[in-house]
Amino acid sequence: MGAGGRMSVAPNNSKCEKKESRSVKRVPHTKPPFTLGQLKQAIPSHCFKRSLLRSFSYVVYDLSLSFIFYSIATTYFHLLPSPITYIAWPVYWAFQGCILTSVWVLGHECGHHAFSEYNWLDDTIGLILHSSLLVPYFSFKISHRRHHSNIASLERDEVFVPRLKSAIPWYSKYLNNPPGRALTLVATLFIGWPLYLAFNVSGRYYDRFACHYDPYSPIYSDRERLQIYISDAMIFVAAYVLYKIAMAKGLAWLVCIYGVPLLIVNALVVTITSLQHTHVALPHYDSSEWDWLRGGLATVDRDYGVFNKIFHNATDTHVIHHLFSSMPHYHGVEATRAIKPILGDYYLFDDTPIHVALWREAKECLFVEPDEGDNNNGVFWYSNKF
């Protein structure tokens, strides 16, 4: 397992304790010897072109698969003998959850104006796709744009902002064990996304309550408030449709067909996005050191195997996405290959199996602090040493 060739794992001589001693080469935190313009010149020009037809084909493909899974479940599952249904339903939930996560990714693509050349069309499609997954489209689009503008800044980044060692809750040390870690991971995966939207959990610090559903939240400016009302209205419409379905089909039917897959979407969104920004080799910066390019490079591409394609390469092309966020997802792999020779050690790739990476980062990335005796006091690294 490695991080772009920069992670080495010492042999494990204690099989009983199964402890690993890692020597991780960190991503450089000094100003890079290249510019954003030089990176752009290295990328084929067609990678920046957005094709409405091609983008829309992914929407049709994902929604068609989702409908096929739905049709199979509602048409045939009730005909199966009881023991088989206990297998069929979890398979449906997994498949449907993965495809709906792909739909979530396409909505996110619309929010970056990476879907087509038409802003209004991108927003219309993104609003429909995200609202169907109970995501307030414009609310998330705006906060996510600020995340891209301030990534890896301890003061201004919008999400996955690590705590300083001095600011971690008193109970954190008591959760720093396998049972506590497992409990925290399960809660984070399945309710972390709605908690972020509703209560700004893991988000940037504000001096008052921040919520993605509140048009007067400190997250938004006066000129953005109308968009928040539109997002809320669409969430209300989606919730009303779900209510009518529950009344017609029953709550249990709705939970099986839609509710559980939506939980899977929540878990996958948190898994993908948290692992894109959490790694012991990645720096964070305070205002004395931060700049946009170094912040944009403080992210990691990971390998999800066949799921890279299923999730439209949101998993293994996140570095290029932060550098050129309006680039369509279907050009991300080619563009990444083009700039890797220039990025050198500034590019981080980790092919650690995802379940292993989740557990490792939950164990090792508890808070950030500067290195002792380091003159770069504005550069912070993940640690778990209380």
Curated annotation (Swiss-Prot):
Enzyme Commission number(s) of this protein: 1.14.19.34, 1.14.19.33
Motif Histidine box-2 mapped to chain: 144-148
Catalytic activity: a (9Z,12Z)-octadecadienoyl-containing glycerolipid + 2 Fe(II)-[cytochrome b5] + O2 + 2 H(+) = a (9Z,11E,13E)-octadecatrienoyl-containing glycerolipid + 2 Fe(III)-[cytochrome b5] + 2 H2O; (9Z,12Z,15Z)-octadecatrienoyl-containing glycerolipid + 2 Fe(II)-[cytochrome b5] + O2 + 2 H(+) = a (9Z,11E,13E,15Z)-octadecatetraenoyl-containing glycerolipid + 2 Fe(III)-[cytochrome b5] + 2 H2O; a (9Z)-octadecenoyl-containing glycerolipid + 2 Fe(II)-[cytochrome b5] + O2 + 2 H(+) = a (9Z,12E)-octadecadienoyl-containing glycerolipid + 2 Fe(III)-[cytochrome b5] + 2 H2O; a (9Z)-hexadecenoyl-containing glycerolipid + 2 Fe(II)-[cytochrome b5] + O2 + 2 H(+) = a (9Z,12E)-hexadecadienoyl-containing glycerolipid + 2 Fe(III)-[cytochrome b5] + 2 H2O
Motif Histidine box-1, residue range(s) on this chain: 108-112
Biological processes, Gene Ontology terms: unsaturated fatty acid biosynthetic process
EC top class, as a word: oxidoreductase
Region Disordered, residue ranges: 1-28
Coarse class of the protein's main subcellular location: endoplasmic reticulum
Motif Histidine box-3: chain residues: 318-322
Pathway assigned to this chain's UniProt record: Lipid metabolism; polyunsaturated fatty acid biosynthesis
Bilayer topology annotation: Multi-pass membrane protein
GO MF entries: oxidoreductase activity, acting on paired donors, with oxidation of a pair of donors resulting in the reduction of molecular oxygen to two molecules of water
Keywords associated with the record: Endoplasmic reticulum, Fatty acid biosynthesis, Fatty acid metabolism, Lipid biosynthesis, Lipid metabolism, Membrane, Oxidoreductase, Transmembrane, Transmembrane helix
Pfam families reported in the protein's UniProt record: DUF3474, FA_desaturase
Location of this chain's protein in the cell: Endoplasmic reticulum membrane
GO CC terms: endoplasmic reticulum membrane
Sequence intervals crossing the membrane: 65-85, 87-107, 182-202, 228-248, 250-270
InterPro entries for the chain: FA_desaturase_dom, FAS_N, Fatty_acid_desaturase
Function: Converts linoleic acid to alpha-eleostearic acid (18:3(9Z,11E,13E)) and alpha-linolenic acid to alpha-parinaric acid (18:4(9Z,11E,13E,15Z)). Converts a single cis double bond at carbon 12 to two conjugated trans bonds at positions 11 and 13. Can also act as a 12(E) desaturase when acting on the monounsaturated fatty acids oleate and palmitoleate, stereoselectively introducing a trans double bond.
Domains: entry comment: The histidine box domains may contain the active site and/or be involved in metal ion binding.
UniProt record similarity statement: Belongs to the fatty acid desaturase type 1 family.
Name used for this protein in its record: Bifunctional desaturase/conjugase FADX
Organism (species): Vernicia fordii
